[in-house]
């Protein structure tokens, strides 16, 4: 036990580095990041104040508190960074230019009809000044407005906003 107490600072440092590496390269769920930062903070605290928290129980308590503090400080900024990688208005950009098949009897520019895209039946209407499309015809997706596809009989090369 005496040998472990002499190297607790280095052990906390190694635990912190391992947790951060696991977060970066293996798990990537933000949990190990907070534990790693808590262990590194605990290592720094043990190095500077060895007599205050000499027992292992106190060090584990401080490790938990440091991890909680790092969680409170970094959770919301990291949550915004991780989950807001794409703009919500551009989230359907992979659909633009794809082909759909008319599923309802007709689809026109002033009434919503249904089209089949990638096996899913979706609501759609035609772009302004388009001739009505009949069942079975092929259309191209030129835009998305909410959960409704905007389609055209002609493929457009640019991603102009037709909404």
Swiss-Prot record:
Localisation per UniProt entry: Cell membrane
Membrane topology: Multi-pass membrane protein
Top-level taxon in the UniProt lineage: Bacteria
Membrane-spanning ranges: 7-27, 51-71
Keywords: Cell membrane, Membrane, Transmembrane, Transmembrane helix
Any one cellular-component term (Gene Ontology): plasma membrane
InterPro entries named in the record: NA-bd_OB-fold
Protein name in UniProt: Uncharacterized protein RP252
UniProt source species: Rickettsia prowazekii (strain Madrid E)
